[in-house]
């Protein structure tokens, strides 16, 4: 007879053997509809006993695989995002496929190609090319064309057809400067990352705005460098020679570099110069002095990003560009103090 009737006979045999309806057998084969684990096991056992091939569609395929692409995990803020994203993805019933970039070796694009080859169901980008005004955006357009849903974290250019979830950099910088102003500081400097990256650009704009509002300073002291300890230490001298009594940094790593450079120059933190970090990463409450810093709401950001991505995976809805901003808190510790004339 035809293959259709052969298939029907097979279904009937399996149903009889497993003592379930043919509809249930069909659900197990097609992976569609609700089947209890016990029933699925009965059907699979019947298939094995009758010598038929098990369905290719194993139940695991209903678990979404979510790619997470981050910069290097040596920076504690990215480790924090990785940890929280992994938890949120697992909590939503998915599997996180973490990929971190290694400078000069594996790029965001390499990771992306490998995830697409692994039939990933959705992707979360953290602080990648999406946040770079000089970055090539073709990779994101390619994902949109392939209908692979993705979301971004911490800054995205408006051309990218995906929602971005980020820390309110403007609110964070305003809180830091406001705190220093209350302590009597006026010559406040901002040390941040490269301004072609969205969060740095937002920090710089907010800093210029509040320095103008509070002190009528139109060209405040700023320095742009990498988000590393060494780069920050190297940039510190210029700011201090220019008379800064307080430095707001774009990351905790930068703040630690600034504190080291100030100490090497024989200055005390916070007696001579106040320093504010940004991120409130692990161990910043244990530094000496304990670091006053802007705390990124990592948990709120990751939960919202994961929930939005899972909704898109489940509904095949097309995502569009939206900016979701989560305001940070200023955590006041011991690296800031009232201004003393130098």
Residue ranges and their predicted role:
Residues 21, 121, 186-187, 245:
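Short acidic/polar active-site loop segments enriched in Thr and Asp
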Residues 22-26, 59-74, 187-193:
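Short beta-strand segments enriched in small/hydrophobic residues
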Residues 177-188:
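Glycine-rich phosphate/diphosphate-binding loops that line cofactor/substrate pockets in enzymes
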Residues 1-63, 340-342:
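N-terminal helix-turn-helix DNA-binding module of bacterial transcription factors
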Residues 38, 70-80, 98-107, 129-132, ...:
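Hinge/beta->alpha junction and helix N-cap segments in small-molecule ligand-binding domains
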Residues 2-6, 53, 63-178:
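Alpha-helical recognition/docking segments in bacterial nutrient-uptake
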Residues 217, 238-342:
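Flexible loop/turn connectors
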């Amino acid at each position: 007879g035809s293959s259709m009737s052969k298939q029907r006979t097979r279904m009937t045999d399996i149903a009889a053997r497993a003592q379930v309806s043919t509809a249930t057998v069909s659900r197990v084969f097609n992976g569609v509809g609700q089947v209890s684990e016990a029933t699925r096991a009965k059907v699979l056992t019947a298939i094995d006993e009758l010598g038929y091939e098990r369905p290719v569609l194993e139940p695991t395929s209903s678990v979404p695989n979510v790619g997470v692409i981050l910069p290097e995990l040596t920076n504690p803020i990215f480790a924090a995002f990785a940890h929280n994203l992994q938890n949120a993805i697992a909590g939503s019933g998915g599997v996180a496929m973490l990929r971190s970039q290694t400078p000069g070796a594996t790029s965001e694009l390499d990771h992306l190609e490998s995830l697409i080859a692994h039939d990933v169901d959705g992707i979360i980008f953290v602080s990648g090319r999406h946040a770079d005004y000089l970055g090539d955006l073709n990779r994101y357009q390619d994902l949109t064309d392939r209908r692979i849903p993705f979301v971004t974290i911490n800054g995205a250019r408006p051309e990218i057809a995906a929602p971005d979830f980020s820390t309110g950099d403007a609110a964070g910088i305003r809180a830091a400067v406001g705190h220093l102003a209350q302590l009597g500081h006026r010559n406040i400097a901002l040390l941040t990352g490269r301004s072609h990256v969205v969060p740095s650009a937002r920090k710089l704009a907010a800093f210029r705005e509040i320095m103008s509002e509070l002190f009528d300073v139109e060209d405040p002291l700023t320095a742009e460098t990498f988000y590393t300890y060494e780069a920050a230490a190297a940039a510190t001298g210029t700011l201090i020679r220019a008379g800064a009594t307080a430095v707001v940094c774009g990351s905790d790593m930068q703040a630690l570099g600034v504190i080291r450079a100030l100490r090497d120059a024989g200055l005390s933190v916070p007696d001579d110069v106040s320093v504010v970090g940004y991120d409130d990463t692990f161990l910043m409450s244990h530094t000496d002095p304990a670091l006053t810093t802007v705390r990124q709401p990592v948990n709120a950001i990751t939960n919202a990003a994961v929930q939005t991505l899972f909704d898109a995976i489940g509904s095949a809805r097309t995502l569009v560009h939206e900016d979701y901003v989560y305001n940070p808190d200023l955590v006041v510790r011991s690296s800031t103090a009232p201004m003393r004339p130098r």
